């Protein structure tokens, strides 16, 4: 289950938030964020809510992005997990299971939520974007994947005061993943090692 959650969001990667003009719509803010952000690091908290209303699964950690294509999504609590994208491959490491899953980046990201943040600026190629009104003090944009096999019905991104503060993922099984970002740094210098991964000795490597 924990591995499935990480694979769904992949990176769901994340970002540093860009101050924008207050009158800009949420879609415009998303485009401006992508245009002006090359690297980002932040902390996140995440809750996965099932369709049957069971207690949400909570987790927290850190993210780093270097656009295009590189990301690092590290869950620290309650169970360590790591997703690293080096631009060519996506590595998913579960220390408790001693397992590493590796996939080609293009196949893994495609129309996934990770593509919204770590990909190039050509969002309309993979997503239909629209302003989705205001709620919880944020202006929202809905991103609906054009591919029918993305595994997601839509992704929502929330802006507050011109900053991108939230991300919500609605999957095909009725689960909702809510992500909130804090301590965001936009365009920091990130060491190259941030986006490199070598499977630890003894780990079971599955995939490409």
Curated annotation (Swiss-Prot):
Localization terms from the record: Periplasm
Source superkingdom: Bacteria
Stretch forming the signal peptide: 1-24
GO BP term (any one): lipoprotein localization to outer membrane
Keywords: Chaperone, Periplasm, Protein transport, Signal, Transport
Disulfide bond sites: none
Described purpose of this protein according to its UniProt entry: Participates in the translocation of lipoproteins from the inner membrane to the outer membrane. Only forms a complex with a lipoprotein if the residue after the N-terminal Cys is not an aspartate (The Asp acts as a targeting signal to indicate that the lipoprotein should stay in the inner membrane).
Subunit structure: Monomer.
Name this polypeptide is given: Outer-membrane lipoprotein carrier protein
Gene that encodes it: lolA
